[in-house]
Amino acid sequence: MSQTITSLDPNCVIVFNKTSSANEKSLNVEFKRLNIHSIIEPGHDLQTSYAFIRIHQDNAKPLFSFLQNLDFIESIIPYHDTELSDDLHKLISISKSKILEAPKQYELYNLSNLTNNPKQSLYFAFLQNYIKWLIPFSFFGLSIRFLSNFTYEFNSTYSLFAILWTLSFTAFWLYKYEPFWSDRLSKYSSFSTIEFLQDKQKAQKKASSVIMLKKCCFIPVALLFGAILLSFQLYCFALEIFIKQIYNGPMISILSFLPTILICTFTPVLTVIYNKYFVEPMTKWENHSSVVNAKKSKEAKNFVIIFLSSYVPLLITLFLYLPMGHLLTAEIRTKVFNAFSILARLPTHDSDFIIDTKRYEDQFFYFIVINQLIQFSMENFVPSLVSIAQQKINGPNPNFVKAESEIGKAQLSSSDMKIWSKVKSYQTDPWGATFDLDANFKKLLLQFGYLVMFSTIWPLAPFICLIVNLIVYQVDLRKAVLYSKPEYFPFPIYDKPSSVSNTQKLTVGLWNSVLVMFSILGCVITATLTYMYQSCNIPGVGAHTSIHTNKAWYLANPINHSWINIVLYAVFIEHVSVAIFFLFSSILKSSHDDVANGIVPKHVVNVQNPPKQEVFEKIPSPEFNSNNEKELVQRKGSANEKLHQELGEKQPASSANGYEAHAATHANNDPSSLSSASSPSLSSSSSSSKTGVVKAVDNDTAGSAGKKPLATESTEKRNSLVKVPTVGSYGVAGATLPETIPTSKNYYLRFDEDGKSIRDAKSSAESSNATNNNTLGTESKLLPDGDAVDALSRKIDQIPKIAVTGGENNENTQAKDDAATKTPLIKDANIKPVVNAAVNDNQSKVSVATEQTKKTEVSTKNGPSRSISTKETKDSARPSNNNTTTTTTTDATQPHHHHHHHRHRDAGVKNVTNNSKTTESSSSSSAAKEKPKHKKGLLHKLKKKL
């Protein structure tokens, strides 16, 4: 049976032109060469086909290098496979019940971790931060509107708060929150399929200075079109005032819409001409190195049109209409109308001109409430409604109908058809297009501009924007994740930066400059409006004055300040705002200067990135791993010190389960090495220095057993956190919780067949291995891997020599030694050698050193050596029935070598006679003379004989 799309579980779909059969053939050849499974089905129309494939990081790079040279590739879709799709749906479903709650930081981190789209995640991070900052602004506006004893319009307290809020928000975003997210979202090289296809024909890279000079040449063009738009806006404003307040002829209700129709028609037409004949040719002449830079240049050039069309109507009303409306008296109107014969023939009012005092309120309410509702509907509902209406009016698209009939012949299953329909929606549906980040940033910043410039008119505006943004966040999140065409693969493809790889510092770019400009301009406009209208002579505006009782108030100047004072006040506010902004910026910058310029300290290391597609319940910081390592190391050190105080002796370092604890133990002894012991890089260095010995000793045994060597296994298993050994691993007694709670069901886990304690034997073996490994690791940790074996030979005289004697050294014992070298290692942790230590003479030291050298050479060839932990009693040795003692000689010149006294007892053996104890002690003593690797094999045989 042929493979289905569902069983393939594709994570990539290639949309290509199938007009030529050679196109599909060339793709199949490349898929076969790279061993990529593929299924090719008809596309959404008769000219396209879909190639469903599943790729991974290894074969993705050569595949895209091949696709970049093909002209028939229309799009590459990083399709979400089953696992990723389930994770994203879970992430979205969590936020369904939190529509009116501010999004959490870890949710954004999980989003970036799953999609590997840092730019999109940064947009949601900006929106999240903006929402959180709107909360206090909204509550303050509500309190001013409903609880203040003064008028809420042009309130000085609200204006001061708005200015400080604006500067604080901008500074915190630029110097705290954006770097915060940039450090966490730009860890991986993101591969944009959109930029990949658009950058096929790469332009020759030009110097940035040349591009900047070419951009400056566009300034006169932008100023010209700005002047044209501003002039037309003033004309429409004058026409509106004339029709609504001066004209007294027929069709006033219909003609009143004429200015709005004119401005709504003229602005798009001017924008099309501006872009088609000036912006695009000039951008092409600038010759940018990538499509992204060219798009940014176009956005910057269009910003002039956007700013004028958005804010000029309110600026005209507040700075022209209200202050100067009183000048339009009957005499002036007569002179103006007589100058134009056409106007003189029109019927007009004979009464004096009275300004509309609520005009600015209506305009601001329209931009804050009605305009945002219209934009939200145009983005989310109108396209779908228009598509449905077109299908009912014109019928279904014939190309789509033929394509669906062709795909019907393929007889796809329901699950396969669901995947095919999803890919089709990416190509045809209104929501299927790639999520436009620039358009959404522009929408948010325009809203921000209205708030910081004109919210002193209506303090409820921040609360309205907060509600709107909470809804927009949920809708945009679903649109971007579930419906829009993905742009990035969830795994890195290009390791090095390229034109299609995003490894630079993550930033919103142009919109940061717009944010700063709006902040400074908003502070100036808010303060100036408050200065002008807080105590003006317009009824119902600002504070009430005595002139409000005068019926001829419209004939007097409504502003109590001269224009010179207003301009000087605006300049003063601008300087103060810039100074406060730079003050906030310098404070935030200084708080993030963790490492000074110059040489980076050795203990500052790069923390490994968390694995991709991992879900977190809180946002991890860059210092997350290293801080936890230090905490664990310090916690381990405090536990050791407590044990030392109780026992009056120091405990040896332990090593278990392939994890090294030597670095942590060394960190406890040397406080300056805490960070070094906890850093992953030095942990890896420590393991690599040990690898040389492990390779020479352990690889043969590990290879014969079909398992990974200890060094490889420990390297793979080691994570960034230090493993803290339990107290039981030190083999000391105390009021501690045992590793296995003793019950009747787990008796076989605690005792062997003969009733001997497994825990005591394991603790003795681990303690003994840790002692020798700690000594060897300390001496050779600075040596490379290849010199570890030679270093062991050179340092053999400096390693503490262990001499184990039991009774007479007769010929039978020597024969057993020879036989032990040929006996394979039997890993039986149930046998615990009982060894007591005492000081021997110098002659014993020499003989033992020679014997130990031979044993080390043999163990290096045959496998890992297992040393026996040695103890030295203070006054007397442990009593035994056969008075057998074990002599241990230790090199006094070795630094940091501690002698430990342990009392061993077998918990599982209670009915053992004196003869059996004597035999066991004798067997253990004679077996201890065997080479360290094979001692347990011989002990196991002796145990069976006994």
UniProtKB/Swiss-Prot annotation:
The modification Phosphoserine is found at S638, S704, S720, S729, S757, S793, S844, S847. It comes from Saccharomyces cerevisiae (strain ATCC 204508 / S288c) (Baker's yeast). The chain crosses the membrane at residues 122-142, 154-174, 218-238, 254-274, 303-323, 448-468, 506-526, 564-584. Residues 628-638 have a biased composition (Basic and acidic residues). Interacts with BTN2. Disulfide bonds: none annotated. This is Increased sodium tolerance protein 2. It is found in: Cell membrane. One of its GO terms (cellular component) is cellular bud membrane. Residues 671-689, 764-775, 884-893, 916-927 have a biased composition (Low complexity). InterPro entries: Anoctamin, Anoctamin_TM. Residues 895-905, 931-946 have a biased composition (Basic residues). Residues 1-121, 175-217, 275-302, 469-505, 585-946 are cytoplasmic.
